[in-house]
Swiss-Prot record:
Entry keywords, A to Z: Cell membrane, Electron transport, Heme, Iron, Membrane, Metal-binding, Transmembrane, Transmembrane helix, Transport, Tricarboxylic acid cycle
General function of this protein: Membrane-anchoring subunit of succinate dehydrogenase (SDH).
Subunit text: Part of an enzyme complex containing four subunits: a flavoprotein, an iron-sulfur protein, plus two membrane-anchoring proteins, SdhC and SdhD.
GO CC terms: plasma membrane
Pfam families tied to this protein: Sdh_cyt (PF01127)
GO molecular function: electron transfer activity; metal ion binding
Topology versus the membrane: Multi-pass membrane protein
Topology Extracellular: residue spans: 35-59
Protein name: Succinate dehydrogenase hydrophobic membrane anchor subunit
Length: 123
């Protein structure tokens, strides 16, 4: 029974990896267009990001983008570790370390986005 639960969790993790990968394609495309291109013309990156982060919808978009990127990367690393032949204890410890890195990264990303959203746009 424990093996079946482990397999389901692994399948769920791999499914989440695929879904977040698809979301990343969408988010990355929107991010690159909005942050770097304005109807085919280059725009000032820093000012455009600050302007966008003043809008609560764009702020939410970028925060979700950070959460999904971080989850996708950490989960991918965890899959790589799971496929190695190191001990289960080492895998568990690395998994815990990766969770800590995930939490620290999303806290940092959230704080940074909220601070940038409060900045005034340079003229």
């Amino acid at each position: 029974m424990a093996e079946t639960e482990k397999m389901k969790y692994g399948s769920l993790n791999r499914f989440a990896q695929a879904v977040t990968g698809l979301f990343l394609l969408f988010f990355l495309g929107v991010h690159l267009y909005v942050a770097h291109i304005d109807f085919g013309h280059p725009v000032a990156f820093f000012s455009s990001v600050i302007n966008q982060l003043h809008n609560p919808w764009w702020l939410a978009f970028f925060l979700i983008f950070v959460y999904i990127i971080t989850y996708h990367g950490i989960n991918g690393l965890n899959h790589i570790v799971a496929d190695t032949s190191i001990s289960e204890k080492a895998k568990r410890n690395i998994g815990i370390a990766l969770m800590v890195i995930y939490v620290i990264t999303i806290i940092y990303g959230t704080i940074l986005a909220l601070l940038v959203a409060r900045m005034t746009v340079p003229t």
